[in-house]
A protein has these predicted regions:
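Beta-strand/loop substructures that line and gate deep hydrophobic ligand-binding cavities in soluble
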Residues: 63-64, 74-132, 136, 141-143, ...
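Intrinsic-disorder/low-complexity, polar/charged segments enriched in Ser/Thr/Lys/Arg/Asp/Glu/Gln
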Residues: 3-7, 44, 57, 70, ...
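Short, hydrophobic/aromatic-rich segments at coil-to-beta transitions
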Residues: 39-46, 65-73
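Hydrophobic ligand-binding cavity/cleft-lining segments
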Residues: 1-44, 129, 133-135, 149-162
Length: 162
């Protein structure tokens, strides 16, 4: 599997940044190529995207989620990928975000694109767009504050600002 790591800082409180990142259905607004993300339940998502000019769909499971700290996922079908997003408060108004993603390019075109740094560049663009989006708004559009461990929701928590 190929690995991408990106770290960036956002001029917003950690709860604002984390809450916005939990709004998976809004990912197409800042991720080029992602056409749709449907949240099926608290821990399952369905993705539809165009990758290297080819339509791809996959299902993903949130395997760990701790408010204001981290979200980890893995694909369960389709395009093979997994990753973690970590949120670290630097002060009351600034947050460091660390994104680690692993994926398996399939076929010649995807492998060639990977070698040329296309995926890394797309991820870089996505984090820059996310940063601009949340910094310009200064508030989240919603948030999911529940916890997930081992792919299962644990304890209280749920949607906010709906």
């Amino acid at each position: 599997m190929e690995r991408i790591e990106k770290t960036f800082e956002v001029d917003c409180p950690v709860h604002t940044v984390y809450n916005q990142w939990t709004q998976f259905e809004q990912f197409p607004s800042f991720m080029d190529g992602v056409e749709e993300v449907r949240q099926l339940d608290d821990t399952h998502l369905h993705w539809r995207a165009k990758i290297a000019g080819k339509q791809k769909e996959w299902d993903a499971e949130i395997v760990e989620q701790v408010p204001d700290q981290r979200i980890a996922w893995r694909s369960t079908s389709g395009a093979e990928n997994a990753g973690t997003v970590r949120f670290e408060p630097l002060n009351k108004e600034r947050t460091r975000v660390r994104l680690t993603m692993e994926y398996e390019p399939k076929g010649f075109v995807e492998k060639a694109g990977d070698m040329a740094g296309v995926v890394s560049h797309k991820v870089e663009n996505a984090v820059e767009k996310f940063k601009k989006l949340i910094e310009s708004r200064r508030t989240e559009t919603g948030g999911w504050r529940g916890e997930v461990h081992g792919g299962r929701k644990t304890g209280p928590g749920g949607n906010t600002l709906q």
